[in-house]
């Protein structure tokens, strides 16, 4: 019995030792202003799990939380931002976010309903020279592993407007993708969180999320 236990422990140790360490983490942005930056608790963990399975990435299973004045900001290739309410960047935070994005980082802003009027003026602090532009359906972000010929999937109805994907392009590079009237992050949450969401809606949201991660990592 003891011999069998040792063999089992040795086998498990071998598996643990052979498993590669995660290559990187995805982060959720903790911003100021009082908005619920922490919304959608299961979104990123579910997206990470999906990406690791579907894209064969090696992302750490637990999301990070990062503030714009944190030294480790530059270590995350993909930062996700969500919420319903107020957003406020200090001048220093806006400079740090600009440095992150112009240095190769990628920000996904997800309108969780009500974010639009707050986030647009704050992103103007970051890139006063840029405007959000709606990306054409031919953009590569819609054509990574998964094809979305009609753009973003519509997860929640909100005001009944069509889902739109906006981008900030810095020197030709997409540095920020803004999913509006879509609620992509809600679609990533555990099935059953929103009873009206079907498994098909959940799957479509995860596939689009995987495209975002794939694009952020390859910029292709």
PLM region descriptions:
Residues 26, 78-117:
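Short alpha-beta junction capping motif
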């Amino acid at each position: 019995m003891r011999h069998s236990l040792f063999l089992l422990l040795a086998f498990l140790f071998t598996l643990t030792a052979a498993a590669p360490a995660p290559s990187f983490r995805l982060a959720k942005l903790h911003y100021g202003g009082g908005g619920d930056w922490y919304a959608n608790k299961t979104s990123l963990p579910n997206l990470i799990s999906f990406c690791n399975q579907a894209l064969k990435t090696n992302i750490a299973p637990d999301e990070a939380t990062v503030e714009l004045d944190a030294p480790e900001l530059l270590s995350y290739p993909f930062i996700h931002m969500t919420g319903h309410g107020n957003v406020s960047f200090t001048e220093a935070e806006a400079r740090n976010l600009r440095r992150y994005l112009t240095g190769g980082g990628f920000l996904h802003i997800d309108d969780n309903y009500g974010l639009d009027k707050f986030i647009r003026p704050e992103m103007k602090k970051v890139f006063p020279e840029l405007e959000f532009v709606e990306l054409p359906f031919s953009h590569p972000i819609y054509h990574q592993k998964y094809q979305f010929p009609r753009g973003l999937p519509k997860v929640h109805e909100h005001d009944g407007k069509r889902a739109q994907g906006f981008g900030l392009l810095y020197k030709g590079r997409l540095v920020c993708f803004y999913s509006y009237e879509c609620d992509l992050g809600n679609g990533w949450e555990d099935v059953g969180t929103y009873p009206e969401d079907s498994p098909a809606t959940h799957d479509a949201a995860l596939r689009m999320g995987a495209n975002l991660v794939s694009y952020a990592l390859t910029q292709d």
